[in-house]
Amino acid sequence: EMCIRDRQYPVPEEIKTLKAERDAEIADVITGKSDKLLVIIGPCSADNETAVLDYTSRLVKVQEKIKDKVIIIPRVYTNKPRTTGVGYKGMLHQPDPEKKPDLLAGLVAIRKMHIDVMKETHLSPADEMLYPENYWYLSDVLSYVAVGARSVENQQHRLVCSGIDVPAGTVSYTH
C-alpha cells in the first residue's frame, strides 16, 4: 500500500530510476570501486526554487565537462539552523519569507524543490538533516545527507544516519 507521501507527492518513475543510478555511482566512490571524486557544492541555503534551479542547471554544464573524474551533488539545504533560535529558519519552516511560518507547506515545498531539481537537471541533491524525523519525507529524493555542526554530536542524528541508505557526512564540530 502506498504511503501518503507517495500518493500525494510522488516521484516520477524516471526520477526513481535516475536516483537509483546516481546512488549506485556515489556508492561506488564511497566504497572505492570508482576513483572519481564526490563534490557536494552549492550555497548554504536554498530558499528560492528559481535560484536553486538556476544554479543546479549551471552545475549540469560543469558536470558534463568533468563526468569522467567527478560526481557533483548539488547542495539544496532547506533548513537554517539557528544557535539562538532567532531568525529565518529556512524553507522548511517558512516557504514564503513574506508570510508566517507554515511547517506543513514547508515540507511540501522542499519535497517539490528536490524533485524539480532532479527532473530539470538529473542531479540528485544533498540536504542537511537538521530534523532527523523529517528524513523519511525526503529519503526517496536525496543522495547525500549532511549533519551540521550543531547536530553532529546528537545521538538521534547519529542513530538515523547509521540506518539510512545514502552517504551521510558531518560538518565540523562546534568545539
Give the ranges of each region predicted by the language model:
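Conserved, mostly hydrophobic/aromatic
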Residues: 42
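Generic structural signal for well-ordered alpha-helices
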Residues: 23, 56-60, 111-114, 157
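Short helix-capping segments at alpha-helix termini
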Residues: 64-68
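Active-site-facing alpha/beta catalytic cores
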Residues: 69-175
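N-terminal glycine-rich phosphate/pyrophosphate-binding loops that anchor nucleotide-derived ligands
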Residues: 5-29
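Glycine-rich anion/phosphate-binding loops
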Residues: 47-63, 102-110
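Conserved small/polar residues in nucleotide/adenosyl-binding loops
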Residues: 2-6, 174-175
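N-terminal glycine-rich anion-binding loops that anchor highly charged ligand groups
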Residues: 25-39
